[in-house]
UniProtKB/Swiss-Prot annotation:
One of its GO terms (biological process) is poly(A)-dependent snoRNA 3'-end processing. The lineage of its organism: Archaea, Thermoproteota, Thermoprotei, Sulfolobales, Sulfolobaceae. Transmembrane segments: none annotated. The gene is rrp4. It comes from the Archaea. CDD domains: KH-I_Rrp4_prokar, S1_Rrp4. One of its GO terms (molecular function) is poly(A) binding. NCBIfam families: PRK04163.1-1 (NF003181). The keyword RNA-binding applies. Component of the archaeal exosome complex. Forms a trimer of Rrp4 and/or Csl4 subunits. The trimer associates with a hexameric ring-like arrangement composed of 3 Rrp41-Rrp42 heterodimers. This is Exosome complex component Rrp4. Contains an N-terminal domain that mediates interactions with the hexameric ring, a central S1 domain and a C-terminal KH domain. The KH domain is required for efficient RNA degradation, but is not responsible for poly(A) preference. Residues 73-144 form the S1 motif domain.
């Protein structure tokens, strides 16, 4: 860790921090984060979280919180809340509503009086990219790109946005466990929504239970193995139950 004498990181890596706790002193070149407050040359945590350090960089990974903070090029799953003349107002689980211009979805200018509900209506989900955002304007969405657009099948599962890294796992280990064991195809968006298509209602139920377990136990080591065992046990119970039914019949 190559720091100057004027720089000091107060806490050990992987420490649990609380709001107002001092993290570091001095001048550090770190990206802006809603979870770190700088006052003069001191850095404080704004949330309950995990303090992570890499060389002279540090961050706070929140362990709780329901809001998503948009970043340009993030992929999100939005819920259409309103249809306006020139586009759609979309909830992306952020403190700000997002906007999807109709011209972006249609690839052309809209016609006067055109009913945009034909393409996206209130209650529809849409997979989109954050095209533009800063703290002076609301997020603008784009659906130009592969696999972007209206969600037309499957289910959407909401989780806390701060749990997204845990659902994906290191080197996608948790993601691969969920998909291979449940048989479901899933897409985890940056804003804490998961789109899933499953081969059966039973697989759907197992997937939802497993994801809730990840949310509730995200602080526990060895969680990927626990989830693998959990799904295998659920499948085993179902297979055992099916076997008993066939025997009795």
């Amino acid at each position: 860790m190559n720091m100057s004498q004027s720089q000091k990181i107060v806490l050990q890596p992987r420490s649990i921090v609380v709001p107002g706790e001092l993290l570091a002193e001095g001048e550090f070149q770190i990206p802006w984060s809603p979870y770190i407050l700088k006052i003069n040359s001191k850095y404080y945590s704004t949330v309950v979280g995990l303090f992570d350090v890499k060389d002279t960089q540090f961050e706070v990974i929140p362990l709780e919180g329901s809001f998503y903070y948009p970043k340009i090029n993030d992929i999100v799953i939005g819920l259409v809340e309103d249809v306006e003349i020139y586009g759609w107002v979309v909830d992306i689980k952020a403190p700000y509503k997002a906007y999807l211009p109709a011209s972006n979805l249609l690839g052309r200018s809209i016609n006067v009086g055109e009913d945009l509900r034909r393409y996206l209506d209130v209650g529809d989900y849409v997979i989109a990219r954050i095209e533009n955002f800063d703290r002076s304007i609301d997020p603008v969405l784009s659906v130009k790109g592969k696999d972007l657009g209206r969600v037309s099948n499957g289910i959407v599962i909401d989780i806390m946005p701060v749990k997204v890294p845990r659902v994906i796992g290191k080197n996608k280990s948790m993601y691969e466990t969920l998909t291979s064991k449940s048989g479901c195809s899933i897409f985890v968006a940056n804003n804490g929504r998961i789109w899933a298509t499953c081969p059966s209602r039973f697989s759907e139920e197992i997937l939802i239970e497993a994801i809730r377990k990840i949310e509730n136990e995200s602080h526990i080591k060895g969680l990927t193995d626990r989830i693998k065992q959990f799904i295998e046990e659920k499948l085993g119970e179902r297979n055992a139950s099916s076997g008993e039914t066939k025997t009795n019949s």
